[in-house]
Amino acid sequence: VSLIVLFKNFELKSSNLRLHITRSACGWTGVAILFSGVIFIPASDAVAITFLNPVFAMLLAIFVLKERFKINRWIATFISLLGMLVLLRPTLDFESNIFAYLCLAGAFIMGVEIILIKLLSEREPFLQILFINNLIATLIGVVPMIFFFKVPNFFQLIELISIAAAMVLGQFFFLNAMKGTETTFIAPFFYSTLVFVMILDLIFFGVIPDIISLIGASLIIVGGLFINLRINFKLFK
């Protein structure tokens, strides 16, 4: 990202520094809560609760961004949400474990982050958003690195670089999507992450999904198709 910014002679002038800092802080906090939750409650529970963030984002979009309430998008989101629950099969025991509520707070914080990304995408070029937010995230990451850093070997370094490249590429596409449409439209597609994880799990680790996982993945796909087919129907009607 830095090389692209330098190559294009980008002027990094932002009047939205508070938004950038808040967005980066929300991202770090949300991920930290997710990782902490996995330690104390089943991983499927932590991930399932955290994946409520698109629902929070849709609610916030209505009140903060003044986006219209569209029933078809909510139907698509809840179909995908149901697919996620089927796929992960969480126990969701809120009564006996306070860390479940911590993960719920993390999901809300991630929902806030999505709204902040939408606000930034309407005010600044996406490359500038990528550069500034990753710079801030790097500076935040220096603090825990001081205490826990271990020199990676060559293969670990390649893996870390690959992860970073994948994350930046994902952010690139996500920012472009946010810039071009409403938050409530994008929300159902968040759950497709689990479908791709299942496919990659099969390709790289030979893990064959069971029938319940396939049903969950199918529901997630149906949620995404529900919006697209409805849009295409309107275009060709």
Give the predicted meaning of each segment.
Residues 4, 93-152:
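Transmembrane alpha-helical segments that form core, pore/gating elements
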Residues 13-16, 84, 89-109, 146-162, ...:
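Juxtamembrane helix-entry segments on the extracytoplasmic side of multipass membrane proteins
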Residues 9, 54-75, 148, 195-214:
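C-terminal transmembrane-helix exit sites in multi-pass transporters
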Residues 21-39, 104-116, 147-185, 222, ...:
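Hydrophobic alpha-helical transmembrane segments of multi-pass membrane transport proteins
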Residues 47-52, 120-136, 171-202:
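Helix-helix packing/entry segments at the starts of transmembrane helices
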Residues 16-26, 69-81, 99-104, 123-135, ...:
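Cytoplasmic-side transmembrane-helix entry/capping segments in multi-pass membrane proteins
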Residues 1-22, 71, 122-124, 135-162, ...:
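Membrane-interface interhelical linkers
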Residues 72-89, 212-231:
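Hydrophobic transmembrane alpha-helices of multi-pass small-molecule transport proteins
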